[in-house]
Amino acid sequence: MKKALAKIQKTEINTYIDEFVKARQKYFTDGQEWLEAKVTDEKIYVQIDRKQLEEELDDMIKISLQFGQVLPLEMKIQVHKVAGGAEISYMDNGAGSWRCGRIYAPEKAGRAASPEKRWGVQIA
């Protein structure tokens, strides 16, 4: 079996997250679940593997839907500019805080220091 290679590409992260959220909102039931994007007007360009980031965010949403245990379940994805890139935060209002997560998206592509960084995203 061949290992898939990461496809790192320059991406304006606020636009990407906004489009990601809009594409998924149609799958939620009104009054039961809601996904919201909190992005800025500032253009923040990062080097990411879009497919990997999409999978990580979808996994966080799936876990919230399975274990949130609250109605209405409100999920938020927020983008912050940080030194050297952007931080993508995910949170929900469900029971417990273990489903919350942060992903670092670097401004410049570089050599990975660890296997986790090879995908172009880091889960904190």
Which ranges hold each PLM region?
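Conserved catalytic submotifs in the C-terminal HATPase_c
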Residues: 34-44
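A residue-level detector for a conserved hydrophobic packing site
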Residues: 53-54
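Acidic ATP/Mg2+-coordinating residue in the GHKL
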Residues: 92
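A short helix-and-adjacent loop within the catalytic ATP-binding
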Residues: 24-34
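Short beta-strand/loop element within the Bergerat-fold HATPase_c
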Residues: 74-84
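A conserved beta-strand-to-alpha-helix junction within the catalytic ATP-binding
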Residues: 9-22
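Conserved micro-motifs of the catalytic ATP-binding
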Residues: 2-6, 45-48
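Conserved polar catalytic motif of the HATPase_c/GHKL fold
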Residues: 58-63
